[in-house]
């Protein structure tokens, strides 16, 4: 920085008790000061300027504890097991619940395990977005292929029969989640660019 800017910032930061007269005259091309030059002003200015702390990159480290937010996103492609049904909660909001099965692929790690599919994994999907919930009820049926993107959450509730506290892991689709029905047998030439753009956004 030039010395004039440093001195002006020093004047602005100094108290009104010690008046400092700096007169500035404008020349043909530049500004210059007719006041005395203080060599310590530049050092004082650099000491008073607060430096911004450098941003630390976040890594996946479980030792960081509660301060680390982590990533808890799930992307599921599979077949619908239980058809979507809507429930009305006590607060008046509507939640759409259905299950999606994934798996059934062949396990190549076992010797002699030809044509032995792995058991399917079932995932409970809870759609808290009303628009996506109505889409799921209208479009999805049992055995239809679906793409689901949402957050992994654990719902804790009290069992009314045994009075035990139970927890259920589920994939919650909220405002930033996605649900798309996957259609087989369609030619790529029949799909418009708007539909492709909608699926990517």
Curated annotation (Swiss-Prot):
Q: Which UniProt keywords apply?
A: DNA-binding, Mitochondrion, Transit peptide
The answer to whether keyword Transit peptide applies is: yes
Q: Where is the SSB domain?
A: 71-184
Xref: SUPFAM superfamilies: Nucleic acid-binding proteins
Where does the record say this protein resides? Answer: Mitochondrion
Q: Which GO terms describe its biological process?
A: DNA replication
What's the short name of a Pfam family annotated to this entry?
SSB
InterPro entries annotated for this entry?
A: NA-bd_OB-fold (IPR012340), Primosome_PriB/ssb (IPR000424), ssDNA-bd (IPR011344)
PROSITE patterns (UniProt xref): SSB
The protein's GO terms of the molecular function aspect are: mRNA binding; single-stranded DNA binding
Residue span of the signal peptide, if any?
Answer: none
Q: Detail the disulphide connectivity of this chain as listed in its UniProt entry.
A: none
A GO CC term assigned to this protein in UniProt:
mitochondrion
| Biological role | Binds to ss-DNA.
* PANTHER family in alphabetical order: SINGLE-STRANDED DNA-BINDING PROTEIN, SINGLE-STRANDED DNA-BINDING PROTEIN, MITOCHONDRIAL
Tell me what this protein is called.
Answer: Single-stranded DNA-binding protein, mitochondrial
């Amino acid at each position: 920085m030039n010395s004039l800017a440093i001195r002006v910032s020093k004047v602005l930061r100094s108290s009104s008790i010690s008046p400092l007269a700096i007169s500035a005259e404008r020349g043909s091309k530049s500004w210059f000061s007719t006041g005395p030059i203080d060599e310590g002003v530049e050092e004082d200015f650099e000491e008073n300027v607060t430096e911004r702390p450098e941003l630390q990159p976040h890594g996946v480290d479980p030792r960081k504890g509660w301060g680390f937010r982590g990533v808890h996103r799930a992307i599921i492609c599979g077949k619908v097991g239980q058809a979507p049904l809507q429930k009305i909660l006590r607060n008046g909001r509507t939640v759409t619940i259905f299950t999606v099965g994934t798996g059934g692929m062949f396990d190549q790690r076992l010797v002699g395990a030809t044509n032995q599919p792995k058991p399917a994994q079932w995932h409970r999907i809870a759609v808290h977005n009303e628009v996506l919930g109505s889409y799921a009820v209208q479009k999805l049926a049992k055995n239809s292929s679906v793409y689901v993107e949402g957050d992994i959450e654990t719902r804790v509730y009290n069992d009314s029969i045994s009075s035990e506290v139970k927890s259920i892991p589920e994939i919650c689709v909220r405002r930033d989640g996605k649900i798309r029905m996957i259609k087989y047998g369609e030619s790529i030439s029949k799909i418009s660019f708007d539909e492709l753009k909608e699926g990517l956004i």
